[in-house]
From Swiss-Prot:
Gene3D superfamilies documented for this protein: Winged helix-like DNA-binding domain superfamily/Winged helix DNA-binding domain (1.10.10.10)
Gene transcribed to yield this protein: recX
HAMAP family, alphabetized: RecX (MF_01114)
Organism annotation: Deinococcus radiodurans (strain ATCC 13939 / DSM 20539 / JCM 16871 / CCUG 27074 / LMG 4051 / NBRC 15346 / NCIMB 9279 / VKM B-1422 / R1)
Protein name, UniProt field: Regulatory protein RecX
Protein role: Modulates RecA activity.
Length: 204
C-alpha cells in the first residue's frame, strides 16, 4: 500500500529480487534566498571622495527641491549622510554659490506668512537655525499696520464662536496669542472687533 507524504525510508530491489531498505535523505535547502521576492541588493557606497561628493551634492539638490530649507537644516541632513565634515561644508558652499540655498530668502518667505504674528515668526526662525542678526533684520521689515489688520481679520472671522464663551475677551486673547501676536496688537484688535459685534447681535 503506498504511503502518502514524505517517507523516512525508501526501498530498492536487490539483484536477487529481494527488497533492501534504504534510508531517505531529504534534499538540503539552499541558504541562498529564492530569486522571487528577493530583496534588492543595497547600492554600494561610493568609494572615492569625488563619488562621495557627487552623491552628497545630488542628495542636497533633492532636499532643496522639496522645500526651501535653511543652512542649518540642510547641514543636519547632510551630516546624517556623511561623516566627513569637510565634505559637508564643501557641498553646502556649492549649493549656496549656485543660488539654491539662501537663508535670507527663507527668512523673507517665513515673514510673509499670513495669519501669524511677529512672535510666532521669531520663534519659527530661531527653531530653523537662523542667526539673531538675520532674524532682527527680517522682523524690522514687518509692517505694524498690516500686522494689526491681520489680527483684526482673524478675530472678526472667529468672533461669533468666541462670543459664546464664558469670557469672550479672554478667549479672543488666547486665540491671537497662540498665533504669535503680542499684547500691543491683541488688545486693540479685541476692542475694535467687539464694537462690530454688539452682545445681542453676537448671540443671534
Amino acid at each position: 500500500m503506498p504511503v502518502c507524504g514524505r517517507r523516512p525510508w525508501q526501498v530498492k530491489r536487490s539483484s536477487s529480487g529481494g527488497i533492501l531498505p534504504v534510508m531517505y535523505r531529504p534534499r538540503r535547502r539552499s541558504s541562498t534566498p529564492a530569486s522571487e521576492g528577493e530583496a534588492e541588493p543595497r547600492p554600494r557606497r561610493p568609494k572615492t571622495r569625488e563619488e562621495q561628493r557627487e552623491a552628497l551634492l545630488a542628495y542636497a539638490f533633492r532636499a532643496l527641491g522639496a522645500r526651501a530649507i535653511t543652512e542649518a537644516e540642510l547641514r543636519g541632513k547632510l551630516e546624517r549622510r556623511s561623516e566627513d565634515p569637510e565634505l559637508v561644508e564643501e557641498v553646502l558652499r556649492r549649493v549656496q554659490e549656485l543660488g539654491y540655498q539662501n537663508d535670507a530668502e527663507v527668512a523673507r518667505a517665513e515673514n510673509k506668512r499670513r495669519g501669524v504674528g511677529e512672535l510666532r515668526v521669531r520663534q519659527t526662525l530661531r527653531r530653523r537655525g537662523l542667526g539673531a542678526d538675520l532674524i532682527e533684520e527680517t522682523l524690522q521689515a514687518r509692517d505694524p499696520e498690516e500686522e494689526q489688520q491681520q489680527a483684526i481679520d482673524l478675530l472678526t472671522k472667529r468672533w461669533p464662536a468666541l462670543s459664546r464663551k464664558r469670557d469672550p475677551r479672554a478667549s479672543a486673547y488666547a486665540f491671537l496669542a497662540r498665533r504669535g501676536f503680542g499684547g500691543s496688537v491683541i488688545w486693540p484688535a479685541i476692542r475694535e472687533v467687539a464694537e462690530l459685534f454688539p452682545p445681542d447681535e453676537a448671540e443671534e
